[in-house]
Regions:
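Alpha-helical segment proximal to the catalytic Tyr-Lys
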Residues: 93, 168-169, 234
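Canonical Rossmann dinucleotide-binding motif of NAD(H)/NADP(H)-dependent dehydrogenases/reductases
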Residues: 1-23
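Short, small/polar-rich loop/turn modules that mediate ligand/substrate recognition or access, typified
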Residues: 176, 236-238
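A conserved structural motif in NAD(P)-dependent oxidoreductases
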Residues: 207-221, 232
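Rossmann-fold cofactor-recognition segment
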Residues: 25-41, 49, 62-65
Length: 257
């Protein structure tokens, strides 16, 4: 199970322990089952959310995503970026009714990864033209891992920027929106990596894990998400919270904004 799936499940577990009602959206096993990489699946989610809770939503958390190594460049953009912003926009009126909040999951790679900034700009400035953008990346080599990783970082960078751009107008109508940028996380997928793969992954330092040869835990990411979605964070809006044990601060110590 990948980082996005396991993080989403841990978020649900924490919320249910606090006796919140939750709705799990997943393409296979969710309370609402839909493919967020296609417009029809997104509309199904939006319609069912309105049917289930016409009175509004207290919170919306978007954890769906695929890595750059999935060998499907269209999927990277359609799920990581277009799927996420479509659900946020489609459920916005439900959040507005209850003064709810929204958290999207990006990645700490946005501050350190090798990305296609031209593509990030296209995503942000032409996000109503999904099909044309997907056709554009279809011409790239999806078996090239570097290309996949660059598109992955671009999709998450564009999502983080989308959150920032919309945060002020959303908050003016009572809806907070923030993003969490996780570092490398322990999952069933990382557990099955080869020794060389684990060595490469651990080469990226995590200050809070020094000497432990381990990664961030899913519950650490989930706790940050649940804080941002809660009333305790009512003064927090438009931030990208790095939950990476200090990796971003270590690599970008001179950047304060």
């Amino acid at each position: 199970m990948g980082v996005y799936a396991i993080t989403g499940l841990r978020v649900i577990s924490q919320l249910e322990k606090q006796e919140h009602e939750t709705i799990n959206i997943d393409w296979k096993t969710g309370d609402i089952q839909a493919d967020l990489s296609i417009p029809e699946g997104r509309q199904k989610v939006i319609d069912e959310l309105h049917e289930l809770h016409p009175e509004g939503l207290d919170g919306l958390i978007l954890c769906a995503g695929v890595p750059g190594s999935c060998h499907d460049l269209r999927l990277i953009l359609s799920l990581n970026f277009f799927g996420t912003i479509s659900i946020i926009k489609g459920a916005y009126d439900l959040l507005e009714k209850k003064g709810g909040s929204c958290v999207a999951t990006v990645s700490n790679a946005i501050s350190q990864g090798d990305l296609r900034m031209d593509l990030a700009d296209i995503l942000n400035n032409n996000n109503e033209d999904e099909l044309r953008i997907l056709d554009l990346v279809s011409n790239l080599d999806e078996n090239d891992l570097l290309t996949g990783n660059r598109l992955y970082v671009a999709s998450k960078y564009a999502l983080a920027r989308w959150v920032r751009r919309h945060s002020a107008s959303y908050a003016a109508n009572g809806v907070r929106i923030n993003a969490v940028a996780p570092g490398n996380v322990n999952t069933s997928m990382t557990a099955t990596m080869s020794v060389d793969e684990k060595t490469a992954l651990n080469a990226l330092p995590i200050p809070t894990k020094y000497g432990k040869e381990t990664l961030m835990e899913p519950d650490e990411i989930a706790s940050a998400i649940n804080f941002l979605i809660s009333k305790e964070a009512r003064g927090v809006n438009g931030i990208i919270m790095f939950v990476d044990g200090g990796t971003d601060a270590l690599l970008n110590s001179e950047k304060v904004y």
